[in-house]
């Protein structure tokens, strides 16, 4: 039997040689190293912030604390606050998901509402500011008196008779009138001006202020005289001509001030 002495030194040298050679396989760091690298690079912190932000956003959007609980209505006189709240059902809605303009759109279809604005107040309040149409004129057509605002928009039929000092315009054409339709703004402005200037400048208080589709604005006096003004252009000149005829005592039953050369008639058969 032959004895083979161990080659321990050779084996150790070969092992050291292998360790010195670079490995072709990538080294995989441990979880501690990966955690430290994540902290140093900010990836872990960014991820945590993202998760917390998502949770906070979900809470804010869907938490009951940010749903409308109180609705305040400001500026109503003719309309009741309950009617406004019912027309704009905001209670229970997430405050972040409400479109202010779209929410008040139904209110603008009401003949009583001129403007409407919605304000949202954190965390759970809504305020609706209403500007109502204010009736300043009565428009009488077909025996019905309609409330009309300053811009000429018809509000609704009057439920009571006009006061004694109210401005009533009588539509002799009896054209159909409906809420929210706009009447001739020039005719309304002229009627208001005549109602003030005739008594104060000419001492003439009209028995009636009327409007006709073909004539425009006209007045009737207590002596059953009819004076046609038409539209508001050259109003001062028209008033000067009327004042001259009244002061001169010129008899007439019909006076048309629309042409550049006005004309009048004095009918004795009682017709104008």
Swiss-Prot record:
It is a single-pass type II membrane protein. The keyword Magnesium does not apply. GO terms for biological process: cell septum assembly; FtsZ-dependent cytokinesis. Pfam families: FtsQ_DivIB_C, POTRA_1. Its main location: membrane. Residues 65-272 are extracellular. Keywords: Cell cycle, Cell division, Cell membrane, Membrane, Transmembrane, Transmembrane helix. Residues 66-133 form the POTRA domain. InterPro entries: Cell_div_FtsQ/DivIB_C, FtsQ, FtsQ_DivIB, POTRA, POTRA_FtsQ_type. Essential cell division protein. HAMAP family: FtsQ_subfam. This is Cell division protein FtsQ.
